[in-house]
Amino acid sequence: MILGCGNFGGIGSAPAFFGQGETLEQALDLMDAAWEKGITWFDTADAYGGGRSETFVGEWVRSRRPDGLRLTTKTFNPMAEGEDHGLAPERVRRQIDTSLERLGVDHVDLYLAHAHDPDVPAAELAGVFEELVAAGKIGAYGVSNVDGAQLRDALAAGSFSAVQNSYSLLDREVENEVLPLCAEHGLWFQVHSPLMGGWLTGKYRRDEPAPEGSRMTLRSGPYEHLRDDRTYDSLEALERRGDPTTLAFAWLLADERISVVVGPRRIEQLEPALAALAQPLSAEEREAISAEFPLVAQS
């Protein structure tokens, strides 16, 4: 399990929400709690909170000096309105240096291309990543938010070792190509958005307004397609089985091919993920839950 730090100092990479999300004090408390629970891999990105997330993680690293911490960061998105974005080699070189400075470390264990850049050939991207490996700035590299064709191009171009995509009961597109490719080539598959913006927590109810401060009141665009009776039918079926958040995590964790990036806003939100680790689903239970989401398998 990996601690997602995307809400530190913002809400993901959206410039409109930079400066929101968790404060430094709240972020430090969350990292302390995760570390105490045995979560030793933290995931961030240069654009999360416009650099605030990396800065907060760096403050934790400098003040706690943890032994055995592993770090992932990513690049692609602009760090402010009007700034550049993409995976051009000169930008990647610049961004890793500024990321390392904010994080207060001399290298990260994993560096991800945060999105596909159609203007940068996969071989060119692999080349600059290999350069960073040789320089000791990154341990390994991978891609994020890619489809099957983009992943095949990457695999043909270099030694990409990890993929991080959205995956949940409400977003199963990766089952078609990406997950099988990862299994075939031995790639580490990491899941972001395991609760689909809170939809798998039970907070969104049929014919009721979204709770104030939830993703559906702040940034509903990626989730509007879920406002559908078929979605609510599946969610209600999940709730009849038990705590939906724990079950959503357990469904993912029952697949041994993957790791889950958990991004709590409060310390107590770590508990369902930890409970899922302690109470694994059988293959039969996972299959039964999968069958309850047949009409929302594609987002």
Model-identified regions with their sequence ranges:
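Glycine-enriched alpha-helix->loop->beta-strand junction motifs that scaffold or abut catalytic
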Residues: 137, 155-162, 181-190, 256-258
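Glycine-rich, positively charged active-site loop/lid region within alpha/beta enzyme cores that binds
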Residues: 4-18, 183-239, 258
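Glycine/proline-rich, positively charged
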Residues: 14, 19, 81-170, 177
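Conserved, mostly hydrophobic/aromatic
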Residues: 3, 27, 42, 57, ...
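A short acidic, helix-capping loop that chelates divalent metal ions and anchors anionic groups
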Residues: 10-15, 78-84, 200, 269-272
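Conserved short secondary-structure transition element at the edge of the structured enzyme core
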Residues: 133, 194, 224-278
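Active-site beta-loop-alpha junctions enriched in small/polar residues
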Residues: 6-8, 45-47, 74-78, 113-116, ...
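N-terminal binding-site loop/beta-alpha segment at the start of enzyme catalytic domains
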Residues: 1-69
